[in-house]
Amino acid sequence: MPHNPIRVVVGPANYFSHPGSFNHLHDFFTDEQLSRAVWIYGKRAIAAAQTKLPPAFGLPGAKHILFRGHCSESDVQQLAAESGDDRSVVIGVGGGALLDTAKALARRLGLPFVAVPTIAATCAAWTPLSVWYNDAGQALHYEIFDDANFMVLVEPEIILNAPQQYLLAGIGDTLAKWYEAVVLAPQPETLPLTVRLGINNAQAIRDVLLNSSEQALSDQQNQQLTQSFCDVVDAIIAGGGMVGGLGDRFTRVAAAHAVHNGLTVLPQTEKFLHGTKVAYGILVQSALLGQDDVLAQLTGAYQRFHLPTTLAELEVDINNQAEIDKVIAHTLRPVESIHYLPVTLTPDTLRAAFKKVESFKA
């Protein structure tokens, strides 16, 4: 009998992903309650969502907060004070950092949280956790909340109109769910059934992304709202979040995310989104594990999707030893999840993996 206690939080209480999804707000909240809502959003996000917002957004009494900070203790305290008393619900409109902040604010105020993602770069709208930062914007830790998000409202047309780099990053980050989960749970038959369900979901999502992403990206380029596009969006927002919710620590992060963290020490990589760097990290993980078949499959897919297959595409020179040494040192820190890999890790083995990826031909 397995003795691996885990906490399962499959997902939000309500998830709607279709044109007109915002109207569901009125199915769960009265006008009186929505007149006491706190809306928090970023400048670009609210501009992108403006034409789709429900009438509730303009109700007298609703609080509107334009947010430009981080999910930091001081910013959340300030937002709580600005929200005022007698509020009914927190509604966050934006990307991952904004939604993390709004989630934390909702818990601070003891209110239900409604997520309105305007990009599909992460599963932040789905997951009941926030990444905390200091006031300088440096990541500190993440907090898993005691309750699920109340509602997620995905309006596909808003995401269709977003810059394509965000969808690409979401594809990269969500592909990692499968490739990292199989490292974290090499013997799933010994683990709780929910972990196995999470792994099965990760595999299904991987297949959707490998089979449909090229078409979805083309459809976005042509401004066509299609089944392929909606499937990829749901795979990122709902599927990615569900995997972690079912499997807990057995379906979260391994080497791909550690490589991402290592790359962040180089300032030139800051311009690249989280999921874009994670996608590259999957290639390095595959090289470390000697999985040439996976490396070939993903390199071919990335070239079709326009995800990076080399450090050069992330503006990092493989021959700059000082920079590569910094990346390796950070990636191999004792706290990093790369150490879940069932292989011996040294600076030399990691350097060899980077070089293998750099010269690999699909």
Swiss-Prot record:
PROSITE patterns: ADH_IRON_1 (PS00913). Zn(2+) binds at residues 173, 257, 274. One of its GO terms (molecular function) is oxidoreductase activity, acting on the CH-OH group of donors, NAD or NADP as acceptor. Binds 1 zinc ion per subunit. Disruption phenotype: Cells lacking this gene show a consistent change in 2-hydroxyglutarate level. SUPFAM superfamilies: Dehydroquinate synthase-like. It catalyses: 2-hydroxybutanoate + NADP(+) = 2-oxobutanoate + NADPH + H(+); 2-hydroxyglutarate + NADP(+) = 2-oxoglutarate + NADPH + H(+). Its cofactor is Zn(2+). Belongs to the iron-containing alcohol dehydrogenase family. Catalyzes the NADPH-dependent reduction of 2-oxoglutarate and 2-oxobutanoate, leading to the respective 2-hydroxycarboxylate. Cannot use NADH instead of NADPH as a redox partner. Do not catalyze the reverse reactions. This is Hydroxycarboxylate dehydrogenase A. It comes from Escherichia coli (strain K12).
